């Protein structure tokens, strides 16, 4: 009580009130706040206050021998007074200026190498062009973007091992460099940094920038590749944007872009083959992008795109848990559903079997040009809030959401039959049938949907069936918003499974991706994509198929030759001859094949008629299922360069030209490689010279295994027997001599014996 009285008494005095309201009361608290702990509480103020002093810097005593006491203007650079509490010298900021101008210069050769990413950025900005500034509302959506251009794609752990190996090679610690990219990077960097004086820690930081992809979740309206993100602060504000064209590319963006193109091409091609999954894997493993194996890029590159994710799933890698429909990425943000098969009738009374999602769910939909929030119940769209770049993009998003909702009025809006097929001529599943139908023409869908009057809500307006905005009415449940919907931020990856038709499912069996979702957009890759698989030969058109087919035969001629003489059927069935068939007119494929196979059989039967160039030239024609018509051809037609061109059965033509003197083959004027004829072509009896040291025992004997080529004979042990393929495609049984002395006589007897053995 006493205290309270005392306080009341004090408060009655006006001075007390003034002190308490106008002045800082507890100085101790404030002093404590700014002095406790090592952390500087107001760094900007501290800096200003320090720099106002004459000697704000302290330095080691040795500095006095390296810097004069006064500069050219006679200003003092350091004080003779010691710094209180340490044996350091107090130094003026002017000393820094003096040092920068007159101090020792070390070698700068390593700077561009260490600060590579910075030097490259300067070049890009120097050559970039900034356009006009436009003031307009910016629809930004947060996306996961790559923020440092010019990096490799190592994982944090891989990069850490490389950095330790480069910067601290003698430190103890288990480091295992396994991947190709780790080994090449380590080797390169060690060479670059010999004799480097820059502090190891700095080098380590800079290497990290170069090796690891750094991503941030940032609001973006416009380009998302790293060369745009590095100038994000210059190109878009809340209500303005500035046009910008980068002055150069960064390899990481090129890799991402080329990877997407390669993956799309591969998925599209795999879809039409007999076993899509096996074909896809074969192509991924045999493709290189910018000289790096595609499978290595897939393992390290976090790009999320439908085709890329299908390739990753095929390789057993984890992918994002969101799913794709109609080119939009759907992510369920709340609710749940169970799936049930249901039969529905279209407006054309066609029956469709659809998998209905029963239950209330909310999704975000993110596309390249539009985003949306979708709330739905069983076969009912409750609300759809869309934002997009333009009318077209908004319409696309609305169509996808309406189809996804599976509402009855959408299914009843179908006019005509649904019979869309994929590239392999298989019918699409019902949901994609509906989607394709309305993507072609959505008029009936929008007209049938129904409209409602709307309340005035900030930032939202209605949209009518003809896609015009309105503040009074809107299509039922649909609203247009000025605000974009952020991409799903989590980078969580899940285990998925893939079936042979390339449908990717999560562990609960939900389909996340299928080839129908792969974009048909064509683009030109920034980095060279080398598809070694014969399945991709046709990607560059008929000429490429032609050249590649002949190059493949030449490269594998030794094996092809043996198969040609021993097991032709197996040879004709090789997948490498598949693309070639599309060049041969359908009507004559079978006749050409029958004719060429008969011709080859005669070559095998008649001594001295083996002709390397002719076999190579005609071989691809023999791959089609043959028709025995007994027809003879002097030339065969193939469709290249937009018309039928003739290839002569005997002799050269513009398509296939073998130059006997240079021993090179040109296909359509392009060099297809060196072609070595058998030494005996056109000259009988040369086999005898080749078979010196071997005794010819007679006709081929299957018990001694498949025929060897003459080059493989050298591996035989003395006294060992083998079948051997000699010049004219004939096979004889030989034995390697036990003594060398009799080799000379071999040549004479060989010729006679071969004739006897064959006849």
Swiss-Prot record:
Changing residue 738 to Q: Complete loss of nuclear localization. It comes from the Viruses. Transmembrane segments: none annotated. The record marks 627 as: Mammalian adaptation. The keyword Calcium does not apply. Signal peptide: none annotated. One of its GO terms (biological process) is cap snatching. Changing residue 447 to A: Loss of interaction with ANP32A. Coiled coil: none annotated. Keywords: Cap snatching, Eukaryotic host gene expression shutoff by virus, Eukaryotic host transcription shutoff by virus, Host gene expression shutoff by virus, Host mitochondrion, Host nucleus, Host-virus interaction, Inhibition of host innate immune response by virus, Inhibition of host MAVS by virus, Inhibition of host RLR pathway by virus, Inhibition of host RNA polymerase II by virus, mRNA capping, mRNA processing, Viral immunoevasion, Viral transcription, Virion. A motif (Nuclear localization signal) lies at residues 736-739. Its main location: virion. It is found in: Virion; Host nucleus; Host mitochondrion. InterPro entries: Flu_PB2_2nd, Flu_PB2_6th, Flu_PB2_C, Flu_PB2_CAP-bd, Flu_PB2_middle, Flu_PB2_N, INV_PB2, PB2_helical. GO terms for cellular component: host cell mitochondrion; host cell nucleus; virion component. GO terms for molecular function: RNA binding; RNA-directed RNA polymerase activity. Belongs to the influenza viruses PB2 family. Influenza RNA polymerase is composed of three subunits: PB1, PB2 and PA. Interacts (via N-terminus) with PB1 (via C-terminus). Interacts with nucleoprotein NP (via N-terminus). Interacts (via N-terminus) with host MAVS (via N-terminus); this interaction inhibits host innate immune response. Interacts with host ANP32A (via C-terminus); this interaction promotes viral RNA synthesis. Plays an essential role in transcription initiation and cap-stealing mechanism, in which cellular capped pre-mRNAs are used to generate primers for viral transcription. Recognizes and binds the 7-methylguanosine-containing cap of the target pre-RNA which is subsequently cleaved after 10-13 nucleotides by the viral protein PA. Plays a role in the initiation of the viral genome replication and modulates the activity of the ribonucleoprotein (RNP) complex. This is Polymerase basic protein 2. It comes from Influenza A virus (strain A/Wilson-Smith/1933 H1N1). The gene is PB2.
């Amino acid at each position: 009580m006493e205290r309270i009285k005392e306080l009341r008494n004090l408060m009655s005095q006006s001075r007390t009130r003034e002190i308490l309201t106008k002045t800082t009361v507890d100085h101790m608290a404030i002093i404590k706040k700014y002095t406790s702990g090592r952390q500087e509480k107001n760094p900007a103020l501290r800096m200003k206050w320090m720099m106002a002093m004459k000697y704000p810097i302290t330095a080691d005593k040795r500095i006095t021998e390296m810097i004069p006491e006064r500069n050219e203007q006679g200003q003092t650079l350091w004080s003779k007074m010691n710094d209180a509490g340490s044996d350091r010298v107090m130094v003026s900021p002017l000393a820094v200026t003096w040092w920068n101008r007159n101090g020792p210069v070390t070698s700068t050769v390593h700077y561009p190498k260490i600060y590579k990413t910075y030097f490259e950025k300067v070049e890009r900005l120097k050559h970039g062009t900034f356009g006009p500034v436009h003031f307009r509302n910016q629809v930004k959506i947060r996306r996961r973007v790559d923020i440092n251009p010019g990096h490799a794609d190592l994982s944090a752990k891989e990069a850490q091992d490389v950095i330790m190996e480069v910067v601290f090679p003698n430190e103890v610690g288990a480091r295992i460099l396994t991947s190709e990219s780790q080994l090449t990077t380590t080797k390169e960097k060690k060479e670059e940094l010999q004799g480097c004086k820059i502090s190891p820690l700095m080098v380590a930081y800079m290497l990290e920038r170069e090796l690891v992809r750094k991503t941030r979740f940032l609001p973006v309206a416009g380009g998302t590749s790293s060369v745009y993100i590095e100038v994000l602060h210059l190109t878009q504000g809340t209500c303005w944007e500035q046009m910008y064209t980068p002055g150069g590319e960064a390899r990481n963006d090129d890799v991402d872009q080329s990877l997407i193109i390669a993956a799309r091409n591969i998925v599209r091609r795999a879809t039409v083959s007999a076993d899509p999954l096996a074909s896809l894997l074969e192509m991924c493993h045999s493709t290189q992008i910018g000289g790096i194996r595609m499978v290595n890029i897939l393992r390290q590159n976090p790009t999320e795109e439908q085709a890329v994710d299908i390739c990753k799933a095929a390789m057993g890698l984890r992918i994002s848990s969101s799913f794709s429909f109609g080119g939009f990425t759907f992510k369920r943000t709340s609710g749940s559903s169970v799936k049930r098969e249901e039969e529905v009738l279209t407006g054309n009374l066609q029956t469709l079997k659809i998998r209905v999602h029963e239950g209330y769910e909310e999704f975000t939909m993110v596309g390249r040009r539009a985003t949306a929030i979708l709330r739905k119940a069983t076969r009912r769209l409750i609300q759809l809030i869309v934002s997009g770049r333009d009318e077209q993009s908004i319409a696309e998003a609305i169509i996808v959401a309406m189809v996804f909702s599976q509402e009855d009025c959408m299914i009843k809006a179908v006019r005509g039959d649904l019979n869309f097929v994929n590239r392999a001529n298989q019918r699409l599943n019902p949901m994609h049938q509906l989607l394709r139908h309305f993507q072609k023409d959505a008029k009936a869908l929008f007209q049938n949907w129904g409209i409602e009057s709307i309340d005035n809500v900030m930032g939202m307006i209605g949209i009518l069936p003809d896609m015009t905005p309105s503040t009074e009415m809107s299509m039922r449940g649909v609203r247009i918003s000025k605000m974009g919907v952020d991409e799903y931020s989590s980078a969580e990856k899940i285990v998925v499974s893939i079936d042979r038709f390339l449908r990717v499912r999560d562990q609960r069996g939900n389909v996340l991706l299928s080839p129908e979702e792969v974009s048909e957009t064509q683009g030109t890759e920034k980095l060279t994509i080398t598809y070694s698989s014969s399945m991709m030969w046709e990607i560059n058109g008929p000429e490429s198929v032609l050249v590649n087919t002949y190059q493949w035969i030449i490269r594998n001629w030794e094996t092809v030759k043996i198969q040609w003489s021993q097991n032709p059927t197996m040879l004709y069935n090789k997948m490498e001859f598949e693309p070639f068939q599309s060049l041969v007119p359908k009507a004559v494929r079978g006749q050409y094949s029958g004719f060429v196979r008969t011709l080859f059989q005669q070559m095998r039967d008649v001594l001295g008629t083996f002709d390397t160039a002719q076999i190579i030239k005609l071989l691809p024609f023999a791959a089609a299922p043959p028709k025995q018509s007994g027809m003879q051809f002097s030339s065969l037609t193939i469709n290249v360069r937009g018309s039928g061109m003739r290839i002569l059965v005997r002799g050269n033509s513009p398509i296939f030209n073998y130059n006997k003197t240079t021993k090179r083959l040109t296909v359509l004027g392009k060099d297809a490689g060196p072609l070595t004829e058998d030494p005996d072509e056109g000259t009988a009896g040369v086999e005898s010279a080749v078979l010196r040291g071997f005794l010819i025992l007679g006709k081929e004997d299957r018990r001694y295994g498949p025929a060897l080529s003459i080059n493989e004979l050298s591996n035989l042990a003395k006294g060992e027997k083998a079948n051997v393929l000699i010049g004219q495609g004939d096979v004889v049984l030989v034995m390697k001599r036990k003594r060398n002395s009799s080799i000379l006589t071999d040549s004479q007897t060989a010729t006679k014996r071969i004739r006897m053995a064959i006849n």
